[in-house]
């Protein structure tokens, strides 16, 4: 409710809501619909990865437009054990198919639990796309990491156990 009030108090949001919905009413549902539409508008189909993938038959084949180091990183992404990055970022656009708890330290954010009211969903969030990730920090649902090195360090040594931690990370 506080977000609804805050947005309604800003003149240009009322104008934008009127353009989008026919009147200036700001509601949770309209905010949700607007955000969902915005996220769907972010399309990346000409990344260096997309271009390389179009040149080969399989994800694990070396991409001709990648350096040796980039191809090595791609193999690690798909095959590193015990858990590869692609275990969670598992679609063609590297978005996860389910919300997950990725073991962030000191995370008090309810995540999906705020919607489902189930304690099994505490700390679970949508797995974001990794397309063009290097050009769009900050990282994690709360923006706590500013570099990809920090993200890698988290997954290497920083995962905090909790009852709802994703099984791929246990």
Model-predicted segments: where are they?
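Extracytoplasmic redox metalloprotein regions
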Residues: 1-57, 62-66
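Short glycine/threonine-rich turn/loop motifs
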Residues: 47-166
């Amino acid at each position: 409710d506080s977000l609804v009030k805050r947005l309604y108090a800003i003149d240009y949001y009322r104008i934008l809501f009127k353009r989008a919905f026919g009147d200036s009413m700001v509601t949770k549902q309209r905010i949700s619909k607007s955000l969902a539409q915005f996220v769907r508008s972010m399309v990346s189909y000409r990344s260096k990865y997309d271009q390389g993938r179009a040149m080969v038959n399989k994800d694990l084949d070396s991409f001709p437009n990648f350096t040796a180091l980039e191809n090595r990183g791609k193999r690690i992404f798909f095959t590193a054990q015990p858990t590869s990055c692609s275990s969670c970022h598992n679609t063609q656009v590297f978005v996860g198919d389910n919300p997950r708890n990725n073991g962030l330290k000191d995370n008090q954010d309810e995540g999906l639990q705020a919607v489902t009211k189930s304690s099994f969903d505490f700390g679970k969030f949508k797995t974001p796309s990794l397309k063009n990730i290097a050009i769009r920090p900050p990282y994690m649902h709360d923006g706590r990491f500013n570099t990809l090195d920090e993200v890698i360090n988290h997954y290497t040594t920083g995962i905090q156990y909790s009852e709802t931690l994703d099984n791929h990370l246990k």
